[in-house]
Curated annotation (Swiss-Prot):
Membrane topology annotation: Multi-pass membrane protein
InterPro entries: NAD(P)H_OxRDtase_bac/plastid, NADH_UbQ/plastoQ_OxRdtase_su3, NDAH_ubi_oxred_su3_sf
UniProt-listed Enzyme Commission number(s): 7.1.1.2
Protein's gene: ND3
Gene3D superfamilies attached to this UniProt entry: NADH:ubiquinone/plastoquinone oxidoreductase, chain 3
Top-rank lineage group of the source organism: Eukaryota
Catalytic activity: a ubiquinone + NADH + 5 H(+)(in) = a ubiquinol + NAD(+) + 4 H(+)(out)
Protein name: NADH-ubiquinone oxidoreductase chain 3
Enzyme class: translocase
Any one GO MF annotation of this record: NADH dehydrogenase (ubiquinone) activity
Length: 118
């Protein structure tokens, strides 16, 4: 069947099991007594300067999300460039459609003013 993917499957299963073990151990062994220090906001080791939960600019959040989207796009482009000549017709047009959708999304965001920093 797909024997070349067994290594990835084993790695995936190992990662999930190890994550579950570590999370379970943290939950079981962790201290569950909340006090003032545990429920207060953490600001780089200093006492909080203001009230916790101050709102931040939603623009900052949107720019961060856009950065993550286009950062993931680059992570898809690098492996595609390596095997482009092996998957030429289908892989090429698939990536062109992928890039076109992302470009249309960027143009839409630009026209709606999502990239303006005020």
């Amino acid at each position: 069947m797909y024997t070349e993917f067994y290594g990835i499957l084993v790695l995936l299963i190992f990662s999930v099991v190890l994550s579950a073990i570590i999370s379970g151990a943290s939950y079981i062994l962790g201290d569950k007594q909340p006090d003032r220090e545990k429920v207060s906001a953490y600001e780089c080791g200093f006492d909080p300067f203001g009230t916790p939960g101050r709102p931040f600019s939603i623009r900052f959040f949107l720019i961060g999300i856009l950065f993550l989207i286009f950062d993931l796009e680059i992570s898809f482009l690098f492996p595609w460039c390596v095997v482009c000549n092996q998957v030429f017709p289908f892989g090429y047009w698939t990536m062109i459609v992928f890039l076109a959708v992302l470009t249309l999304g960027l143009v839409y965001e630009w026209l709606k003013g999502g990239l303006e920093w005020e």
